[in-house]
Amino acid sequence: HRDSETPGSAEETDESATLQLETRNPILENRVFMEGAYTGPEFTDEEIQSELEASGLTYEWHSSRGLTRRAAQDIADGAVVGWFQGRMEFGPRALGNRSIVVDPRRGDMKDILNDRIKKREPFRPFAPSILAEHVGEYFEQTHPAPTMLMVYRVREEKRAEIPAVTHVDGSGRLQTVSREVNSLYYQLISDFHELTGVPVVLNTSFNENEPIVCSPREAIDCFLKTRMDVLYVGNYGVRRT
C-alpha cells in the first residue's frame, strides 16, 4: 500500500520492520519522516494545580517566558531539574517533555544523577539535547536526530566543554531540537545557551527505576522520593526546601 506509515518509537526494536518495508516496497516515494514523538497524554493547568494542592507542596506559577528563563538559570547553577511539559513522548526515550535536565559542562553530573536518582551502572552514558542549528559545531555529523536514534562523534575540541554527555569513546547519542518540533524545550535550551554559551543540555528520562512518569501525580511522586532540586510541571515550579 502506497500510504503506509511506520512510526518510530525512539528505540531500536522497530528498525527491522521499517527496513523490511522499504526493501519490499521499492516504489515508496515522497517519504516523510516523523520529526517528533509527542503523541501521549497531556494535562491541563487545572489538573496540574489540583495535584500540587493535594501534595501539600509550595509552588509558584510562571509565564511561559519566565518558566524557561528560570529553569535555564537553575540548570546553569547546577540544579537537577525535573521537566514535565505537554504531551508525553511515545517510546522509551525522553525527548524534552518528560525529562530530567542538567548542565552538561559538569564532569561530575553523571555521578550526581546516578547517586541521587538513576542508580544505574556508571559506564552508561547520558544523552545530549542540542539546538538543531548548532549540531555541526559540536558533532562530526549534522543529520537531524530528533528522536535520539543516532550516535555521533563529538568534535574533539568540544569534548572537554560537554563532558557529562561525551561517552568514553568520544560519542554522544544526541537529540536535535528545533523550534518547529518542540518550541518550549527549544526555548529552554536557547535560554541556557544565552546564559552559558553552550547550546546543549544533558537530557535523561524522568524516572527512577520505573517507567517514565506520565501524569503530574507521578512526576510529583518521583520528585518527592528522589533528590531532585526543582520540578517544573506545566507552568508551575516546585523547589526543594
Task: Mark where each language-model region is.
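Flexible beta->alpha loop and helix N-cap segments adjacent to enzyme active/binding sites
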Residues: 1-3, 11-14, 18, 22-241
